[in-house]
């Protein structure tokens, strides 16, 4: 973030929260473009480079200076030659630049507010995999879990309201409202199952920022008020992942009086909360009655104080020992490993049954095959097929793309307790790559593999296998190394979900 700070004239703009002048700066669009190129994705994003150039940015800024407010309207875009096949190009560029403007000054404020505070370093906490060690440590001792479907706002203005507390620039807020209503026109009305249907797939960064700020409204009340009753410090680490400290402090001052008495009635010192995508999990060591109290408290909080309609069926309460959590591409559960211990006391011996709880994570095969079939790597039954759209690429590019996808999936799902699903996914991608190359060279798969040999297989040599082979070079082929490879590996550098791991 230090490299971005020099771009901002803090005394001129940030002192009064004036963000709108930054929309006319060329480097803002360069930062947005770099973010699009550097984000971690599984599948390629073709054509992104062709849609953004310095010439288009200059013309866009010139037209904004001319106060031609029709440049990003849906009616004008059909007649504009610069749009080409993408009629909302200008609006996409401005929205991506706008979210960069909003995010970076807010991050700078966050950094200044955290100076002198002892908070766990955020590098590891930003990783998605950091959630699973937390579950391994805490969920073994809990009884009930509530799967919560976070309600979506019924009106676009609700997404703008959280920003009004710290953005005093009316022009920026009006521009944001304009984006939201334009997306609504382009993508039709919202549907109950897809709250992000307002937005095209390429503008999800703006939506995620607004959605996080909206959800943080009630999380700030729930987490910070309840954190005073928690025995562990996990809540502090969790708040690190939300990125909205300034808003949290303001919300607590406003709403603490209303909710403190209510929360005190059913405080729970063994409650844990985590949020992912449009869902959240609330786990507790308490009873079913206590979980039902939390359920109706959240419903009343959403409806009465945040004007968001929700129904009781959106919160499912289950006993943790009989329930699997389906989130972030994993099926997570707590299972009992039975064991029998023989105890000898003088002349008598006893057999004692002992059950040890174990946190288990597996990768569901059916959603993975559905994702691969949607990406045209196999059919709905899991049989590999060729990728015709990549047949025009060079052999090295085709192998590199398939190999990168395979390594990314193995990297993301390295925490699986059972590797059978990963082996099958690797087989599908490997054979799909062979079929694509055979299609390009007008040959059969058998003849092509016979000619290429084992060189094709080396591209699908996963990172975990390389690490084990370097760490245990002599024992890599023994049963000991196979046992190590079956263990879960959590990485602390994964900051986004792979497309094929997102089954929504």
UniProtKB/Swiss-Prot annotation:
Record localization = Plastid, Chloroplast
Q: Name one GO molecular function term.
A: RNA binding
Alphabetized PANTHER family for the sequence: MATURASE K
Its keywords, alphabetically, are: Chloroplast, mRNA processing, Plastid, RNA-binding, tRNA processing
Q: What is this protein called?
A: Maturase K
Q: Name one GO cellular component term.
A: chloroplast
- InterPro entries per the record? Domain_X (IPR024937), Maturase_MatK (IPR002866), Maturase_MatK_N (IPR024942)
A Pfam family annotated for this chain is: MatK_N
The processes (GO biological process) annotated in the record are: mRNA processing; RNA splicing; tRNA processing
Belongs to which family? Answer: Belongs to the intron maturase 2 family. MatK subfamily.
Q: Source species, please?
A: Mentzelia laevicaulis (Blazing star)
Q: Describe its function.
A: Usually encoded in the trnK tRNA gene intron. Probably assists in splicing its own and other chloroplast group II introns.
């Amino acid at each position: 973030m230090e490299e971005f700070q020099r771009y901002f004239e803090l005394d001129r703009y940030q002192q009064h929260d004036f963000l709108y002048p930054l929309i006319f700066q060329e480097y803002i669009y360069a930062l947005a473009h770099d973010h699009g190129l550097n984000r971690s994705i599984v599948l390629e994003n073709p054509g992104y480079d062709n849609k953004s150039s310095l010439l288009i940015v200059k013309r866009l800024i010139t037209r904004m200076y001319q106060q031609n407010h029709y440049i990003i309207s849906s009616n004008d875009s059909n007649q504009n030659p610069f749009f080409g096949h993408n009629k909302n190009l200008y609006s996409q560029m401005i929205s991506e630049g706008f979210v960069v403007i909003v995010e970076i000054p807010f991050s700078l404020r966050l950094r200044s507010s955290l100076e002198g505070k002892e908070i766990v370093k955020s590098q590891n906490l930003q990783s998605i995999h950091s959630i699973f060690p937390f579950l391994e440590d805490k969920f073994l001792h809990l009884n009930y879990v509530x799967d919560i479907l976070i309600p979506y706002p019924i009106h676009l203005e609700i997404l703008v309201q959280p920003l009004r507390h710290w953005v005093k620039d009316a022009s920026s807020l009006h521009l944001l409202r304009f984006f939201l209503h334009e997306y609504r026109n382009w993508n039709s009305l919202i549907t109950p199952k897809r709250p992000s249907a307002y937005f095209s797939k390429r503008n999800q960064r703006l939506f995620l920022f607004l959605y996080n700020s909206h959800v943080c409204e009630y999380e700030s009340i729930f987490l910070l008020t309840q954190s005073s009753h928690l025995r562990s410090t996990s809540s502090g680490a969790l708040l690190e992942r939300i990125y909205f400290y300034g808003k949290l402090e303001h919300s607590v001052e406003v709403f603490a009086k209303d909710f403190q008495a209510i929360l005190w009635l059913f405080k729970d010192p063994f409650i844990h909360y985590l949020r992912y995508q449009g869902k959240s999990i609330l786990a507790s060591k308490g009873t079913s009655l206590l979980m039902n109290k939390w359920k109706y408290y959240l419903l009343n909080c959403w409806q009465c104080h945040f004007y968001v309609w929700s129904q009781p069926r959106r919160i499912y309460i289950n006993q943790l020992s009989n329930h699997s959590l389906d989130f972030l591409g994993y099926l997570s559960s707590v299972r009992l490993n039975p064991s029998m211990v023989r105890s000898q006391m003088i002349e008598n011996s006893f057999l004692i049954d002992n059950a040890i709880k174990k946190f288990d994570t597996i990768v569901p095969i059916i959603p993975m095959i559905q994702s691969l079939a949607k990406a045209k790597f196999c059919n709905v039954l899991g049989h590999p097929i060729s990728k015709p759209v990549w047949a025009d690429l060079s052999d090295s590019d085709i192998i590199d793309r398939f190999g990168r996808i395979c390594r990314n999936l193995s990297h993301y799902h390295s925490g699986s307790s059972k590797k059978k699903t990963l082996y099958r996914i690797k087989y599908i991608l490997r054979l799909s790559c062979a079929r694509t190359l055979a299609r390009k060279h007008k040959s059969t798969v058998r003849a092509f593999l016979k000619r290429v040999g084992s060189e094709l297989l080396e591209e699908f040599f996963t990172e975990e296998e390389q690490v084990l082979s370097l760490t245990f070079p002599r024992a890599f082929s023994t049963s000991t190394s196979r046992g190590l490879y079956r263990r879960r590996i959590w990485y602390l550098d994964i900051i986004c979900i792979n497309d094929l791991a997102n089954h929504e």
